[in-house]
Amino acid sequence: MNNLELGGAERVIAILSDYLAHQNCDVSIIVLNRLHNQQALNSNIKIIPLNQNKVLRSFFPLRSLLRKNKYDFIIGNMWPITILGLAASLLSLRKSNVLFIEHSIISNEYNHQSVAFQRIVKLSIRLLYNFSSQIICVSNGVKNDLEKLGVKKSKLKVILNPVDIHSELSDHDEYDQHSLNWKDFTGIKILSVGNLRINKNYPNLFKALRVLRDKYNQNFISLIAGDGPEKESLRALITEYSLEDHVILLGGVQDTESLYRNADLFVLSSDYEGFGMVLVEALGYGKTIVATDCESGPREILGNSEHGYLCSVDNPERLAESIYKAYLNKLSPDILLQRYKDFDISLIGKKYLSLMQEMKSD
């Protein structure tokens, strides 16, 4: 992986690695660089930093590492790390099963880059992804996208992202330093969690919150846990929309439990997702969810509004209306928790183990 920072894909790898380690697998996580603000991991898992800031510069250290160590499986997460892992494995002259886990809709992920860069991404996928042993897609939307990009259907398998129910759910309900912003507040407590990137479309959320305030006369505090390149532009929008008393950017938050527990609603305003891990986390706390019906993930997780409120993408009026309706008509926490259990690592992990055993026996 690139690193083990506080992101959805990184969280998935931490959970999966922990599960495999408990199944007596010898697990190492190779990262380009080690960050201080990273996922907590099982002490039996080896973290091997390549101490490189660029993917291309990581090729030779990675190839050298793979030559010195025999791995049964090399699992690459997300382009371009997938390509790096495949190339280093092939040229290490060691025989390993190369498994990719693709977490995003690649056709959308790089659409803000230059046309030339987008062509390079798509060409590399069409030419190289079919050389992998297998590609795990975290949603049907990711699978469909890779098919369109030229990956053979036989190479693709959908396994939804896992959560670790036993480690993530506890009985604590106190307010921490972040959720203190809600303590004694009587309005709507809205939570969003995710990196501050373009695809999360927080401007859509801010516009919806303005409608919620001006049209529906609601008082609320919206806490956003996450960091990223759009932080300064989002701060400017908060001021422009006069939302300083309503929206708080918390930055990266290591432990979001208190935030989830004390929220009234969880809101996702994205233009697209690969899966939407935060939606599953919100289900685990029995929180009513409002999410844009973007590709892909929200509908696969929430169904046709059985487990959350879905609204059209980039439509502030509809998003505001859904937030208002969801607050007045919250879903049963018991039903949401039951859906959450469908993503337990004890179920999802078995699918990974079964696949790996099949690949090893071929």
Regions found by a protein language model. Give the residues of each.
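N-terminal strand-loop element at the rim of the active site
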Residues: 1-56, 145-147, 157, 229
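A conserved mid-protein helix/loop that constitutes part of the nucleotide-sugar donor-binding site
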Residues: 7-15, 188-211, 229-236
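Conserved acidic donor-binding segment of nucleotide-sugar-dependent glycosyltransferases
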Residues: 49, 303-316, 324-330
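Membrane-proximal helix-turn-helix segments that form the acceptor-binding/catalytic region
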Residues: 63, 116-135
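Short His-centered aromatic/hydrophobic patch
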Residues: 76-84, 102-105
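A short, active-site helix/loop in glycosyltransferases that binds the activated sugar's phosphate group
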Residues: 130-156, 163-167
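Aromatic "clamp/platform" in nucleotide-sugar-dependent glycosyltransferases that forms part
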Residues: 252, 271
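Short hydrophobic beta-strand element within catalytic cores of glycosyltransferases
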Residues: 288-292
